[in-house]
A protein has these predicted regions:
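Basic, low-complexity terminal or inter-domain segments flanking catalytic cores
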Residues: 2-4, 15, 150, 183, ...
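C-terminal or mid-to-C-terminal helical accessory/interaction module adjacent to the motor/catalytic core
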Residues: 112-194, 243-244
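Metal- or metallocofactor-binding catalytic centers and their adjacent structured scaffolds
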Residues: 215-252
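A short, conserved structural fragment
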Residues: 282-297, 491-500
Length: 694
């Protein structure tokens, strides 16, 4: 009789089943099997916040099958994911199947490889009650906030709204940033740059100080021109030359937050898309010559630890592929930068078999999984490589009563950069190589240019920078970053605008109400403290009932007071204006949000019920008919697509984005797909890479 092993997904079951053989039957629970009821609170507030769990609708047949298999099996092992959610699934499975949670029937796999599965099976343990209680406390807290607060929002703002404990903080961060941008007053300044010749080569130095070392930054054109006049006929010479060496270190292997940030910057992935691909890589894919195997370690982690075995395997590969000089000569260790300590003892995200290169894997997988594996593999390998060595030079140039400065570097040993360098969110100050210079050397002025500039407001959050802010402030956990962003967008509180996150008018109205009536709920420090309290529950240092009660007593009092404060009042969400006019009555139309996104409605509602689909002119011309403009539209499910304005006379449509660049072959509108631009006009076939930004 075989032992029964239960995991979450069929893909994971297939991979593990291959390693365990015929003595085990591996089956899937298809995620959670029990949860709080959707139609009621499901928490007994008067009796220790006891959750009233029920079987998830549609899982009855599966539960019956699991019970039957467990009854006839020679033992049951629960092998769900090694985190809070996985522990909760195992706890509920044990409860339903009548297993003793104190018996060693729980196994976990940090990597789903032959070695990883063997290691996990060799160390069964009891269900971690503290880990489960941390998940249970989070679930109860989120239900209390959502179930109690949502009806308040229905009455005071709009029906159908909902609120969340962590999501509300994310909306606040985004709204606060928007307020900063709106209140920002730009200051004018001028850069004065001198292009200087040194022999046959030249470089650019920027005005920095006067002769006494006082910083100079002209605030007007008049100031800049006065400096230019003061430089007329001046001799430019090297006043100070500093040379040095520096070593640039690689970034550590990914944790969940940095994986999502880098995939957003480098690959353009949303956090949800990243985690979906990572889940596939962890659970197992079929690799030619290797069979079905998990390609990466567990992807929900905030630990930067790497096993000695993985480090040794990486260094062995590096020596063979790049040479001994490229191996880091010492053991690298990193300390987590997050506001809280690492959640568990997982490793960082790394390839489960370091010697399995992306080129080899690409023969068997493609698309998102291939791109993400290449990024994970490259980052991990680079983390074990030698530093990039650079010679640095900074020069101060004297000219009359002014001093100009420039700096640069040359790479003397590329080290880890031969394989991987981290992408950046913002434009960094560029350093370039300087020509050979000597102290006192007279330079030739080739150009003197003043350029007007203005200080810039802080940038809106992207998914990458929001995740970074959440992590740094201790808000949420590795498993929650992606759902937080998905939720606030789905609820209509935030929208994407050119990959930036912008609060909607609805989001701003709700955030304003929350800040006014429930300041502690949207307070960053308060939310971070709650995460620390949940960590204490997980480590057995706090009781989950008391943790919930401490929060709920204050929350319930705030809710009661808010009801009194808002009695007879309602928050009006302003309509977003548009340039469209109603075809029925001629009144201006406004932008409203419905079930499937934004649409145009007559401002005279309810007297006039005129509506239109909201379309956006992209500026491109249809490649099929050559007459109609390409319009941005939304499908019934809210997905953006592009179609000809002459529909239905012309039925051209595409999911790919039109761009301003025209086809070099026929002059038609080009469309972007991934990293290439292509012409969609029949018979043309022109393609080109997406131009790199300067």
């Amino acid at each position: 009789m075989a032992k029964l092993v239960i995991v979450e997904s069929p893909a994971k079951a297939k991979t593990i089943g291959k390693y365990l053989g015929d003595d085990y039957e591996v089956t899937a629970s298809m995620g959670h099997i029990r949860d709080l009821p959707a139609s009621q609170l499901g928490i007994d507030v008067e009796h220790g916040y006891a959750p009233q769990y029920i079987s998830i609708k549609g899982k009855e047949k599966l539960i019956k099958e699991l019970k039957s298999k467990a009854k006839h099996a020679d033992g049951v092992l629960l092998a769900t994911d090694p985190d809070r959610e996985g522990e909760a699934i195992s706890w509920h499975l044990a409860n339903i199947l009548g297993l003793d949670p104190h018996e060693p029937n729980r196994v976990t796999f940090d990597e789903i490889t032959k070695k990883g599965v063997k290691e996990g099976m060799a160390h069964p343990r009891a269900i971690d009650e503290d880990l489960f209680n941390a998940q249970q406390a989070r679930r109860v807290l989120d239900r209390l906030v959502g179930y109690k607060l949502s009806p308040f929002l229905w009455r005071k703002v709009r029906r159908g709204l909902s609120a969340g404990r962590v999501q509300s903080v994310a909306v606040r961060l985004i709204d606060d940033r928007e307020k900063e941008i709106e209140s920002f007053k730009p200051d004018e300044y001028w850069n004065v740059d001198a292009t200087l010749g040194a022999g046959h080569k030249s470089f650019t130095a920027r005005l920095a100080t006067d002769a006494s070392g006082k910083k100079l930054l002209p605030k007007s054109e008049a100031e800049a021109r006065a400096i230019e006049k003061g430089l007329e006929g001046a001799e430019y010479a090297v006043a100070e030359l500093k040379k040095g060496k520096r070593a640039k270190q690689p970034t550590p292997a990914f944790i969940t937050s940095t994986l999502q940030q880098e995939a957003s910057r480098r690959l353009g992935f949303t956090a949800t898309r990243t985690m979906r691909a990572a889940q596939t890589l962890y659970e197992g894919v079929d690799i030619a010559g290797h069979g079905t195997m998990g390609l990466i370690t567990y992807m929900r982690t905030d630990s930067l630890r790497i096993s000695d075995e993985a480090v040794a395997a990486a260094k062995e590969y590096i020596a063979g592929a790049y040479g001994e000089a490229y191996i880091c000569p010492y053991k690298r260790t990193w300390k987590t930068k997050s506001a809280t300590a690492a959640q568990d003892a997982h490793e960082a995200i790394r390839p489960s078999v370091p010697s399995l290169t992306p080129d080899e894997v690409d023969k068997s997988i493609s698309g998102d999984t291939a791109k993400l594996y290449r990024m994970i593999w490259s980052r991990f390998m680079a983390s074990q490589m030698a530093d990039c060595q650079q010679d640095t030079v900074s020069v101060t140039v004297s000219a009359a009563d002014y001093r100009f400065k420039a700096s640069g570097y040359t790479v003397t040993f590329d080290g880890f950069t031969v394989l991987y360098e981290e992408a950046t969110d913002e434009k960094e100050k560029k350093e370039t190589a300087l020509p050979p210079l000597e102290q006192g050397q007279v330079l030739k002025l080739r150009d003197l240019k003043s350029e007007q500039k203005f200080t810039q407001p802080p940038a809106r959050y992207t998914e990458a920078t929001l995740i970074k802010a959440l992590e740094e402030n201790g808000i949420g956990r590795p498993s929650t970053y992606a759902p937080i962003i998905t939720t606030i967008i789905d609820r209509g509180y935030v929208e994407r605008d050119q990959k930036k996150l912008k609060p909607t008018l609805l989001g701003r109205a709700v955030d304003g109400l929350m800040l006014e009536q429930f300041p502690h709920i949207v307070d960053v420090d308060f939310s971070a403290e709650m995460e620390k309290n949940l960590d204490k529950v997980e480590s057995g240092k706090a009781d989950w009932h008391k943790t919930v009660d401490d929060f709920y007593q204050g929350f319930a009092a705030s809710l009661e007071q808010a009801e009194k404060n808002m009695e007879g009042k309602k928050v009006k969400v302003p309509d977003e204006p548009s340039s469209e006019v109603c075809d029925l009555c001629g009144r201006p139309m406004v932008i409203k949000v419905g079930k499937y996104g934004k649409f145009l409605a007559c401002s005279g509602f309810p007297e006039c019920r005129g509506t239109k689909r909201l379309v956006k002119d992209t500026g491109g011309i249809c490649p099929k008919c050559g007459k109609g403009r390409m319009l941005e539209r939304k499908s019934a499910k809210g997905r953006i697509y592009y179609g000809c304005e002459r529909y239905p006379d012309c039925d051209f449509m595409t999911w790919d984005t039109p761009v301003p660049t025209k086809c070099e072959k026929c002059g038609s509108t080009l469309f972007r797909k991934g990293s290439k631009l292509y012409c969609a006009k029949e018979g043309c076939g022109f393609e080109m890479p997406v131009p790199k930004k300067e």
